[in-house]
């Protein structure tokens, strides 16, 4: 999927993936507004993150990726209605531990993977 998106967007030019995220049903949020896959659990989110990053790293044209966003949106929705589990933390600033742990693990390997080690 990443390879197809990158090829369509950039040809041979470098590309920065500006926003991506995955939502999960077990967050307790409605998740009725907002883009991206709606998965079952936070573990599924963590595994999807790892697959996505590894796919991005496999393409030398991808020079960076950016997770959307720090905190979940409110259950009632923000001004445009988005009410989804996009965050690394919930609205009480409590981290989704399994996701944060996986991100820490994966992000710690990015440079080595990109350098072929």
Language-model region placement:
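Glycoside hydrolase catalytic-domain groove-lining segments
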Residues: 1-34, 50-54
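Metal-dependent phosphoesterase/phosphodiesterase active-site architecture
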Residues: 43-50, 54, 63, 102-117
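Histidine/acidic-residue-rich catalytic or RNA/ligand-binding cores of hydrolases
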Residues: 26-36, 77-85
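Aromatic-rich peripheral "rim/lid" segments of glycoside hydrolase catalytic domains that contact
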Residues: 8, 68-117
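Generic detector of leucine side chains in alpha-helical contexts
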Residues: 5-6, 16, 29, 37-39, ...
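The substrate-binding groove and active-site-proximal loops of carbohydrate-active enzymes
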Residues: 31-45, 94
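Long, C-terminal catalytic modules of enzymes
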Residues: 42, 48-84
